[in-house]
């Protein structure tokens, strides 16, 4: 789990131009997929999630505190699933896709007991009691801690509450524009939860809308005017819950608490070893226009198989602790992550268009320590990676991926771009993946990138590399690589006609004809696709 946490801030860089949302939730060893406002509304059938879905054309903030949108986000719809059998006193971790470093503010989490099935309840009719909060502490905002902890936030459920169906309402509040009325930006997320065990407590709470007022001191506030004390909006934290940081005690102590409300005794931090960098600094390291490339051949053990039907697995294990990363050192850090991972690479030769896709599965004995098995980075082959977009049809579990580095030629595209007559052995556009889901390893063959362009890199001119390292159900997985000017010139991205022999134009980043041919052939050949 440490490695997953360490690199989680890279997990959905496709959305970094916008705000964040909860992409995943973990309780113990169980992982659950969040609602994706960019995709789920268009999927048929609609994906079944544990997080309430919302849609406003993206994932913008809620500013009007008088509407139902403040409860579970804009036009929220009930989640179809529950996080089942969660013991009172358990920890729940929310994983956000990304969060802009300039969006400073507090983080609050509430619970509300439903009347029967939460899916049948109007969330604005429920009573919410706060179980976690953090605002400004020692000059650092809670959202800054979220980013430093790889866009994850952990809360502890109260141990004395009664069993039943609950909504857990987790929200971030951005205050960069809160010096004006209705400038505060709320990002609430609601999740269905079945709590077991516990005691008999049924805490009284507040309702949404109603709990927040536009002129509350923690909502209408100028955070850039030398602020040292900040009053977190809403009620104090309920007594038996503990926070992921010290602030739960310190913040609630600043408020006038009603008699009988007990503050937590222990608030030990559950922060994991992390990479401290902002998502915005990462965004600046890759081109705003996606560039799609093949893997560069490396000197690693990923050698081509000897025969068409050969499948060879190579495993290498090393542990190198990654302490920090910066945008100027992403490539070297990537090599460290590669060494840290357990690498499983499966090579597949597809010289003949009639070659059958490989599909095999092996399931080792179950283990009582899924902690080790769930560390699942994307496997990288030393110097460069390709931009690929696939969808996982697995059950929301974290998976790892190995990519066949022999798929496309790695020499300069202007000098060696294949034509219809001299395409390389892998002309059918197949990729091979070894997918690891906890204790299960499966080999898949899939087609070329689902996008409209592939650019071949020369290994000498590849620059910064950014990878996404976690796959979840029905969520696109993207690996980014940024080309230099030399690469763009060599592949027809604004280059002369001579640089793009397969299209005859070479202007505006046209797609090479051999790439289009790869993709068309692959559609007919691959039986199992992400």
UniProtKB/Swiss-Prot annotation:
Cellular compartment(s): Secreted
Catalyses which reaction(s): [(1->4)-beta-D-glucosyl]n+m + reduced acceptor + O2 = 4-dehydro-beta-D-glucosyl-[(1->4)-beta-D-glucosyl]n-1 + [(1->4)-beta-D-glucosyl]m + acceptor + H2O
Function: Lytic polysaccharide monooxygenase (LPMO) that depolymerizes polysaccharides via the oxidation of scissile alpha- or beta-(1-4)-glycosidic bonds, yielding C1 or C4 oxidation products. Catalysis by LPMOs requires the reduction of the active-site copper from Cu(II) to Cu(I) by a reducing agent and H(2)O(2) or O(2) as a cosubstrate. Amorphous cellulose is not a suitable substrate for LPMO9C, which may act at the surface of cellulose microfibrils without any release of soluble products.
Species this chain originates from: Geotrichum candidum (Oospora lactis)
Full protein name: AA9 family lytic polysaccharide monooxygenase C
Annotated keywords: Carbohydrate metabolism, Cellulose degradation, Copper, Disulfide bond, Glycoprotein, Metal-binding, Monooxygenase, Oxidoreductase, Polysaccharide degradation, Secreted, Signal
The family this protein is said to belong to: Belongs to the polysaccharide monooxygenase AA9 family.
Superkingdom of the organism of origin: Eukaryota
Comp. bias (Low complexity): 238-251, 348-368
Principal localisation: secreted
Gene Ontology annotations for the cellular component aspect, listed alphabetically: extracellular region
Signal peptide: 1-18
Industrial and biotechnological uses noted in the record: Lignocellulose is the most abundant polymeric composite on Earth and is a recalcitrant but promising renewable substrate for industrial biotechnology applications. Together with cellobiose dehydrogenases (CDHs) an enzymatic system capable of oxidative cellulose cleavage is formed, which increases the efficiency of cellulases and put LPMOs at focus of biofuel research.
Pfam families for this protein: AA9
Matches recorded under PANTHER family: ENDO-BETA-1,4-GLUCANASE D (PTHR33353:SF10), PUTATIVE (AFU_ORTHOLOGUE AFUA_1G12560)-RELATED (PTHR33353)
Renumbered residue ranges of the record's region Disordered: 238-279, 297-329, 348-375, 492-512
Disulphide bond pairs: 72-190, 114-118
Cofactor: Cu(2+)
Glycosylated residue positions: 150
Cofactor note: Binds 1 copper ion per subunit.
EC number(s) reported in the record: 1.14.99.56
One GO BP annotation of this record: cellulose catabolic process
